[in-house]
Curated annotation (Swiss-Prot):
InterPro entries: Oxoglu/Fe-dep_dioxygenase_dom, PKHD_C, PKHD_hydroxylase, Pro_4_hyd_alph, Pro_4_hyd_alph_FE2OG_OXY
One GO BP: intracellular iron ion homeostasis
Residues making up the signal peptide according to the UniProt record: none
Swiss-Prot/TrEMBL cofactor(s): Fe(2+); L-ascorbate
EC assignment: 1.14.11.-
Keywords of this entry: Dioxygenase, Iron, Metal-binding, Oxidoreductase, Vitamin C
Protein name: PKHD-type hydroxylase KPN78578_12210
Fe2OG dioxygenase domain: residues covered: 77-176
UniProt entry tagged with the keyword Ligase: no
Length: 224
């Protein structure tokens, strides 16, 4: 699980908030199967509206230009982002995301990673935590507006009931060029180490050796 900060700037978050106030919202169960529908109580932006098209394009632009997101996800395909909101009493019980999903005209994609981009500051609502279960236990996530959490789509997860205010977010899925979570995590850690060493010492012989190792591993594990 990775915390990706500052996907949106403060000004961009404010603009999203302004536009979300004008959105047309529908029952969030329209995008899930029977298992998810039984535990899902929220609202989503109507994907047939021009406003939705603008907002999802803006999120995609921000993600494609964010180096840390690219390093952590190694995206081959990013789904069209969706937008949800939870008011008082609304929640989404524990569930697992589908292994594959239809991604518009692009066709089917495998869901290796799930991502939630928070669009409200945590002080503006109570409850509404994203709870993610993995082999190390439960992780409760409630990030600042404009920050994103990235986690394996195979994880059981839920959104706890909102008790005050409104929680708004964008959510999406990624098919990675590297399918295996452990391999992808190793590449991410190696890339972060390389970037840190480059910042301190420049492109020395040791850094170039690590960079060579990174690309050889990427070449071995990538599916394109």
């Amino acid at each position: 699980m990775y915390h990706i900060p500052d996907v949106l700037s403060t000004d961009q978050v404010a603009e999203f908030t302004r536009q979300l106030a004008q959105a047309e919202w529908v029952d969030g169960r329209v995008t899930v199967g029977s298992q998810g529908a039984a535990v899902k109580q929220n609202q989503q932006i109507d994907t047939r509206t021009p406003l939705y098209a603008r907002l999802q394009a803006a999120v995609l632009d921000m993600l494609r230009g964010h180096p840390q997101f690219f390093s952590a996800a190694l995206p081959r395909t990013i789904s069209a982002p969706l937008f949800n909101r939870y008011g008082p009493g609304e929640t989404y019980g524990f569930h697992v995301d589908g292994a594959v999903r239809q991604n518009g005209e692009a066709g089917w994609m495998r869901t290796d990673l799930s991502a939630t981009l928070f669009l409200c500051d945590p002080e503006s609502y109570e409850g509404g935590e994203l709870v993610i279960e993995d082999t190390y236990g439960q992780h409760r996530v409630k990030l600042p507006a404009g920050h994103l959490v990235l986690y394996p789509a195979s994880s059981l997860h839920c959104v706890t009931p909102v008790t005050r205010g409104v929680r708004q977010a964008s959510f999406l899925w990624i098919q990675s060029m590297v399918r295996d979570d452990k391999q992808r995590a190793m590449l991410y850690d190696l890339d972060r180490t390389i970037q840190s060493l480059k910042a301190r010492f420049g492109d020395g012989e040791e850094v170039l050796s690590l960079l060579n190792m990174y690309h050889n591993l990427l070449r071995q594990w990538t599916e394109v």
